[in-house]
């Protein structure tokens, strides 16, 4: 039974309930909060997967945090998912193993889940619940923030217009990322998506300064990394990569490993984004948020939904998964009057390489494009194996062009896309009719296809190409074709750029290409 009674329903009146409840409420209102600050219960009536059902609960609130004390003294925390009469359903973040229905005590805190945030969190490693695991001291909180964040007024959002140079040619030239964008990496098991994300972290920087007065010093850049359900090898890879590059002091890691509780994965990305919002909007830093693996997050969501016996949607995922994913992805961007920004790169592994699976399908709806990691390219030893045809950046048009990158950027990108797509068709046709049946134009497209994958897409994991070097490399490939075949580039552009470096080319580099 409950040892004390809460008083958090100040609008409750005795007229609307039975006299006994009304009397309890009056006692709660007049309770001395110094001696009885919180409500404790020993009324666990059932445990179902990650959920605990409490009975005889008075005035429980939706999303309220509950602290559990197990018989051995272990502390766990949970959140109220549903209240029905005197029963409350609580989702336990650290898992329900060891919870005894007779001896476990539950304490209702009367508050939502808040996380301590501070600029000192940079350089620290936390578990999926936000507790330090690097043997360092607890965080001296500057603020305690709601992990669900604050809604941003759409009118105060700034349209992302500053291109981030990643040093990776297929991204910079054909799928340019703007500061404040949310763009996921669609990958699959066994593909080098972690290496690509680490390379972006190492090499990301602005092409040039924008009109606004902002601080572009390196100290003003921070990375928030959240891992959900990853193995120890992946966590160690990112940690060692940050340490080797000397950027660990600007990185905050949240690690929920594969052997950690599944249910903890639901709050891990929200803790990371709350920290990122504090760094971006209070400390005015430019924050890059990497979330991996969003597929593990969605499966944790499905597990809770199944335990609550909700009506399942496609492939057993809950019908509200779209809304839930949006509450994470929409926390990227820039805000008027604040110097910081949040750029999101979620990583998700497509089950069975299926892009129509609900997780990549819904993610593609919400985010502003995607970077598609291709297994066939990976099998041909191409790194990074980015397939540019299904990849997309919806904010690219506003981040490139004269004054931002170079005036030929958009036209070169369109022409490379067109030639690569035609080259793929020719390659498929060659498999049917043979090379002898191809026209001279078809052979040019086939040559372009091979050189595009070998020289443009392929680069080393520590090779950092500027966007201008990548554009020049694109022109070098387009010179395979005569001018009249470059139909996507205006005449004025071909006159200026087509033969611009022809006399300066080193003959050895042409033969190598």
From Swiss-Prot:
Region annotated Disordered, chain positions: 1-21
Pfam assignment, any one: ATP-synt_ab_N
Result of knocking out the encoding gene: Mice show a higher urinary pH and a more severe metabolic acidosis after oral acid challenge in comparison to wild-type littermates. Mice show diminished innate avoidance behavior (revealed as a decrease in freezing time and an increase in the number of sniffs in the presence of trimethyl-thiazoline) and diminished innate appetitive behavior (a decrease in time spent investigating the urine of the opposite sex).
Transmembrane residue ranges: none
GO BP annotations, alphabetical order: adult behavior; ATP metabolic process; calcium ion homeostasis; chloride ion homeostasis; olfactory behavior; ossification; pH reduction; potassium ion homeostasis
Localisation per UniProt entry: Apical cell membrane; Basolateral cell membrane
Keywords: ATP-binding, Cell membrane, Hydrogen ion transport, Ion transport, Membrane, Nucleotide-binding, Transport
Composition skew (Polar residues), residue ranges: 1-18
Keyword Membrane in record: yes
Keyword hit for S-adenosyl-L-methionine: no
NCBIfam families: PRK04196.1, V-ATPase_V1_B
Family: Belongs to the ATPase alpha/beta chains family.
Quaternary organization: V-ATPase is a heteromultimeric enzyme made up of two complexes: the ATP-hydrolytic V1 complex and the proton translocation V0 complex. The V1 complex consists of three catalytic AB heterodimers that form a heterohexamer, three peripheral stalks each consisting of EG heterodimers, one central rotor including subunits D and F, and the regulatory subunits C and H. The proton translocation complex V0 consists of the proton transport subunit a, a ring of proteolipid subunits c9c'', rotary subunit d, subunits e and f, and the accessory subunits ATP6AP1/Ac45 and ATP6AP2/PRR.
Reported function: Non-catalytic subunit of the V1 complex of vacuolar(H+)-ATPase (V-ATPase), a multisubunit enzyme composed of a peripheral complex (V1) that hydrolyzes ATP and a membrane integral complex (V0) that translocates protons. V-ATPase is responsible for acidifying and maintaining the pH of intracellular compartments and in some cell types, is targeted to the plasma membrane, where it is responsible for acidifying the extracellular environment. Essential for the proper assembly and activity of V-ATPase.
Name used for this protein in its record: V-type proton ATPase subunit B, kidney isoform
């Amino acid at each position: 039974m409950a040892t004390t009674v809460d008083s958090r329903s100040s609008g409750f009146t005795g007229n609307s309930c039975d006299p006994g409840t009304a009397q309890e409420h009056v006692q709660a209102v007049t309770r001395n909060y110094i001696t009885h600050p919180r409500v404790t219960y020993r009324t666990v009536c059932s445990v179902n997967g990650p959920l605990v059902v409490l009975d005889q609960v008075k005035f429980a609130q939706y999303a309220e945090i509950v602290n559990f004390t197990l018989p051995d003294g272990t502390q766990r925390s949970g959140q109220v998912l549903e209240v029905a009469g005197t029963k409350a359903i609580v989702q336990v973040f650290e898992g329900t193993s060891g919870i005894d229905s007779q001896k476990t005590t539950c304490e209702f805190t009367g508050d939502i889940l808040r996380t301590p945030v501070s600029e000192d969190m940079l350089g620290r490693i936390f578990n999926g619940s936000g507790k330090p695991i690097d043997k360092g001291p607890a965080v001296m909180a500057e603020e305690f923030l709601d992990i669900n964040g604050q809604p941003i007024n759409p009118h105060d959002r700034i349209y992302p217009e500053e291109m981030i140079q990643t040093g990776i040619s297929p991204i910079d030239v054909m799928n340019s990322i703007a500061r404040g964008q949310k763009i996921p990496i669609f990958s699959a098991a066994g593909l080098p998506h972690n290496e690509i994300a680490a390379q972006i972290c190492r090499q990301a920087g602005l092409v040039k300064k924008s009109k606004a007065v902002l601080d572009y010093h390196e100290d003003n850049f921070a990375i928030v990394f959240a891992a959900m359900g990853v193995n120890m090898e992946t966590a160690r890879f990112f940690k060692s990569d940050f340490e080797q590059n000397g950027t660990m002091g600007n990185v905050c890691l949240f690690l929920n490993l594969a052997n950690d509780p599944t249910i903890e994965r639901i709050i891990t990305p929200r803790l990371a984004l709350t920290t990122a919002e504090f760094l971006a909007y209070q400390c005015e830093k430019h924050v890059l948020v990497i979330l991996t693996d969003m597929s593990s997050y969605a499966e944790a969501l499905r597990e809770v939904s199944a335990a609550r016996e909700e009506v399942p949607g496609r492939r057993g995922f809950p019908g509200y998964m779209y809304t839930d994913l949006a509450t994470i992805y929409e926390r990227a961007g820039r805000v008027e009057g604040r110097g910081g920004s949040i750029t999101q790169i979620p990583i998700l592994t497509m089950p069975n390489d299926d892009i129509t699976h609900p997780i990549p399908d819904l993610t593609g709806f919400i985010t502003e494009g995607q970077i598609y990691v291709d297994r066939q390219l990976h099998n041909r030893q191409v790194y990074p194996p980015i397939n540019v045809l299904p990849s997309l950046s919806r904010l690219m048009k506003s981040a490139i062009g004269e004054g931002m990158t170079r005036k030929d950027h958009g036209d070169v990108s369109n022409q490379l896309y067109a030639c690569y797509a035609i080259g793929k068709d020719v390659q498929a046709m060659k498999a049917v009719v043979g090379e002898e049946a191809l026209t001279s134009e078809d052979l040019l497209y086939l040559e372009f296809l091979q050189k595009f994958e070998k020289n443009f897409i392929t680069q080393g994991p520590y090779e950092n190409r500027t966007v201008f070097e990548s554009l020049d490399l694109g022109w070098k490939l387009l010179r395979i074709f005569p001018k009249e075949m470059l139909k996507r580039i205006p005449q004025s552009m071909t006159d200026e750029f087509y033969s611009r470096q022809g006399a300066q080319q080193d003959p050895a580099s042409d033969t190598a290409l």
